[in-house]
């Protein structure tokens, strides 16, 4: 059964960038291919390494509007075709200890997440663990992306390592429910009081865990041996980045365990 295409408002024209908690991170609806895409690449640095096909095609168009929920961020994004990638260097550079949940309103991608093949179409919701590697090739798209701390979601599922690369079919009940919730967060993001943002995100994490539970059971675990090799490579990249940072700041009084934890987004055991 084909997935439904989820209606999407025009982002660049209607985004209330002056409202509290709403920030326009990037906008390039017209312009030279190289200059526009370079701005886009810088806006995503630390989250994804991005590249465009060699032939370039039409001038690059894209936009990101972010809604700040304190410990989480949700964005509305539209852009042209490109490749998204996270390898050990990207992971070490960004230091993100988060999950990324994406609803594709229009367009989609084909890709892989540490050996798990992915195919996302309009209406689908996918999930990435940002401590792990992935690569996707997307056509022109519009999506909603939620950046959620690991500490909110991981305790709610039995095997959080199995979340990476899961796709929730947009034609299913759980897929439709989660898609509607993500769209509601975008629509009401500017109106949510900061004092309510934490409980809202806790409830959102619970909904994500519930909606993906059956998808986890059907998909089964990822290739344990291959995933372990990749995770060891990522760990080594992060440790290398930490060693370089320590060497460069040995004489600084601000070089403390807490400073390292904050910079590299790690927690005490």
Language model region names:
Residues 2-60, 65, 108-268:
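Alpha-helical bundle regulatory/interaction domains
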Residues 40-44, 61-84:
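A short glycine-rich, His/Asp/Glu-containing loop-to-beta-strand
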Residues 70-72, 78-84, 89-111:
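Glycine- and acidic-residue-biased ligand/ion/polar-headgroup-sensing regions
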